[in-house]
Amino acid sequence: SRACGFTALEGAETISGKLSVSNYTQNDLITFPGIKSIGTYSQSGGKANGQTTVSFPDLEQVGTFQMSSCSYLKKLSAPKLTEVTDKWDTSYMQYVDEGDLELPLLRKIGVFKFWGGTYSGAASQMKLTGMADFAGVTEIGSVDIKYWGKMTDFSGLKNALPSLSADKWNVSGNGYNPTWEQITAGEYVKP
C-alpha cells in the first residue's frame, strides 16, 4: 500500500485558510497527519476510480469541508473530527458505502449538503443506502440530501432532528425522501 503524505505540511497543526487538493492520481491513501484544524478543505477531481482513502487522523475541526466529483473516493477517515462549523459539501461519492465515512466523534455540522450524484440521472450509480455514518451528530443547521438512488434509511440523523425545523429539511431525489412530518414521526426507513 502506498501512502501520499504532504511533507510540506509536516509540523502544521492549524491551517486557517484553504487547503485545496485537485487532479491527483494517487490510488491508495492520501493522509494529512498532525493537522487539527482547517479553515476550508477543498478536494476535487482525480483519477483513482473508487480506490482512494482520504485520512485526517488528527483533525478535530474544519470550517468548510468540500469534496466534489468524489468518484475517486472509497473511504474518508476523520476519527477525531467533532465539528464542521460552516458547511459540509460533498457530491458524487459513487463508491462510498455504509461504514466508509469514519466520523465517530462528529457532533456538529453547520450546513449539511450531502449529495450522491449531482443530477437525478446519476442517483442510481450511488451505493450508499443509509446515514448510519452520521449517527453521532446531534446538531445540524440545515439539511440538503439529494441524488442517492439507493438511500432508504435516514435513522442515522435522528439524534440531530431536535436541532432542525421543517424549513431546514430538504431531501429529494433519493430512494426514499421523507418529508419533515414523516421524519419527525419516526418514519426513518422506507416502508
List each language-model region with its residue ranges.
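Concave beta-strand-loop units of leucine-rich repeat
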Residues: 1-11, 15-55, 61-191
